[in-house]
Regions:
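Periplasmic-binding protein-like
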Residues: 176-183, 208-212, 219-220, 251-275, 290-312
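Extracytoplasmic ligand-binding site segments that recognize negatively charged/polar headgroups
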Residues: 51-62, 82-85, 99-227, 231
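A ligand-binding cleft/hinge motif common to bilobed small-molecule-binding domains
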Residues: 108-114, 231-254
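A bilobed periplasmic-binding-protein/Venus flytrap-type ligand-binding module shared by bacterial periplasmic
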Residues: 148-153, 268-280, 299-302
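Bacterial lipoprotein signal-peptidase II cleavage site
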Residues: 19-40
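An extracytoplasmic/periplasmic, membrane-proximal ligand-sensing/linker region
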Residues: 202-204, 308-346
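Short, polar/charged alpha-helical segment
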Residues: 40, 45-78
């Protein structure tokens, strides 16, 4: 996830309104490097070509492209990338009539659509995931939350490093922290899930609201914003994606990461096949299988969260307290948490 901006919008019965505002769309065609006229007529090839709609970052698209090109699908697919809300909106508006054969999207979106409209087919030859997952999606990448500090600014500010996310609500951290806004970033939802799991929804919402108040001008719409503020020396403490802070520390920056006592919560993005009945692309299932089987090693380099049995990551990329929210993650639950936090801050 290059952290795409999120906006809280109402989710109607048709789910036409979605909430994560992302970047604009572009097209990345997997068939541009291959021979367009190899063995089939263009019309026949087009009929079998797999259209993939994705909200993934450039690194993830590149990894999936490498996997497909190296395993017999060069020239047999087209990627089209969208912001999360844009892709969610297309799925809501078009349903099974959408052009895409395969979608990759945040799992809470996929689950919400499946619950409402049964948009996705059960996957064949699905690899075994570490955490239980439904039959209609398979994860492609995961992101885990953590606290991080600029060690130099922390010392200059004469602050103790926090042990918990809740510590950031203390008066001494006011003006010294940067966190993502629950209304603007899915990364903030990781922070909110952690605090609500530890304190309950009502008390947790008050804590998150107090943290946002302490952040002041450093309350960021982008999930990557807090770490950027720490790199620039504009804040001492922040919350964001753990692997990004690990990478900064490895590069020699004065950044360190802290696994909060509330836990390291996780969000996943996954691939699913659009169920179009008899019109379902016969190659779609194989494309998803190849992305997972051959794309995961490269994806792990950019998103070092083990998702499948047998996968391993380096010691520094293993969170001390891996955690998952007690309820299934859905768009509706995110909206509920957004409202609860903002109401608590009034």
């Amino acid at each position: 996830m290059n952290l795409k901006k999120l906006l809280a919008l109402g989710l109607s019965l048709t789910m036409a309104a979605t909430l994560v505002a992302g970047c604009g769309s572009n097209t990345n065609a997997g068939d541009t490097s291959g021979d367009q006229t190899a063995d089939k007529t263009s019309s026949d090839k087009s009929a079998q070509q797999v259209i993939i709609y994705s909200n993934a970052d450039d690194e993830a698209i590149t990894a999936m492209t490498h996997a497909l090109d190296s395993n017999g699908y060069q020239g047999q697919y087209v990627f089209q990338t969208f912001g999360t809300s844009e892709l969610g909106g297309k799925l809501a508006a078009e349903g099974k009539n959408i052009e895409a054969d395969v979608v990759t999207l945040s799992t809470y979106y996929l689950d919400s659509f499946q619950k409402k409209e049964k948009l996705f087919a059960d996957l064949q030859n699905k690899a075994k995931t570490i955490q239980p997952s439904p039959s209609y999606w398979t994860p492609i990448l995961g992101n885990t939350g953590a606290l991080f500090v600029n060690t130099e600014v922390l010392k200059q500010s004469k602050l103790e490093a926090p042990k918990s996310i809740a510590d950031l609500a203390k008066p001494e951290y006011a003006g010294h922290i940067s966190v993502p806004d629950i209304m603007g970033s899915s990364t903030s939802w990781l922070m909110t899930q952690a605090v609500m799991s530890a304190q309950g929804e009502e008390a947790g919402a008050k804590t998150v609201a107090a943290i946002e108040k302490n952040a002041g001008a450093h309350l960021e719409k982008s999930g990557s914003g807090p770490l950027k503020k720490l790199r620039a020396g504009e804040a001492a403490v922040g919350f964001g994606l753990r692997h990004q802070a690990v990478a900064d520390k490895a590069r020699g920056l004065p950044i360190d990461y802290i696994d909060p006592t509330e836990g390291n919560f996780q969000l996943q993005e996954a691939a699913a096949v659009v169920d179009k009945g008899a019109k379902t692309n016969p190659n779609a299932q194989k494309v998803v299988e190849i992305i997972v089987k051959y794309g995961r090693p490269e994806l792990l380099k950019f998103y070092p969260v083990a998702l499948y049995e047998g996968e391993t990551v380096s010691a520094e990329n293993k969170p001390a307290r891996p955690s998952f929210y007690k309820e299934p993650l859905t768009v509706e639950l995110l909206q509920k948490h957004q409202k609860t936090v903002k109401d608590a801050g009034k």
